[in-house]
A protein has these predicted regions:
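Secreted/periplasmic carbohydrate-active enzymes, especially glycoside hydrolases
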Residues: 1-169
Length: 169
């Protein structure tokens, strides 16, 4: 902090009240540190790094396309697509419909088809049914990590038809 004796290194651009840095009536005690929950992650094998789900809608069905990546236990900064290497890692996908029906896809699926899906609609237009997606990562057939999210099956379109003033978008 060039030119200031009352600021700590790294706190030059922090948004705090000036008095917290000791120039006024208080001590030189900027409130900094851990202020949200902290989690320590331990593992004996790799873990799921990310799951990307892309939806493809057709008449009477929705196909979910999965892209699952994992972190190896040796280097958590590295990301490896699951199923692209013969390293013993596979994943299984279970989708639970709003009515409780389960659809299971094993052996590192890239796609999963939902027949007669219940679509998610904006508030006031229809219902908002959610599907629970569970991805289980396994090493040599033994589960090592699980990822769970709830998703809505929906499409979005932009109405660009001309009206009396021009196009709406």
């Amino acid at each position: 902090t060039h030119g200031s004796e009352d600021a700590m290194d790294g706190f030059v651009n922090i948004r705090k009240a000036h008095c917290m840095f000791g120039w006024d009536w208080g001590a030189h005690l900027p409130d900094a540190g851990i202020f949200r929950p902290v989690y320590l992650l331990t593992m004996t094998e790799g873990r799921i790094d990310s799951v990307y789900i892309r939806q493809e809608h057709e008449e009477g069905k929705v196909t979910l396309h999965f892209d699952v990546s994992r972190n190896p236990k040796e280097d958590l900064r590295k990301e490896i697509p699951v199923g692209k290497e013969a390293d013993g890692y596979t994943y299984e996908v279970t989708v639970t419909a709003p009515d409780g029906t389960k659809i299971i896809a094993k052996d590192t699926p890239e796609d999963l088809v939902i027949e007669q899906p219940k679509l998610w609609w904006p508030n006031g237009v229809g219902e908002q049914p959610l599907y629970e997606v569970n991805v289980t990562l396994a090493k040599d057939g033994q589960p090592v990590d699980r990822w769970t999210r709830k998703i809505g099956l929906r499409t979005m379109t932009m109405d660009i038809h001309p009206d009396e003033w021009g196009e709406s978008f």
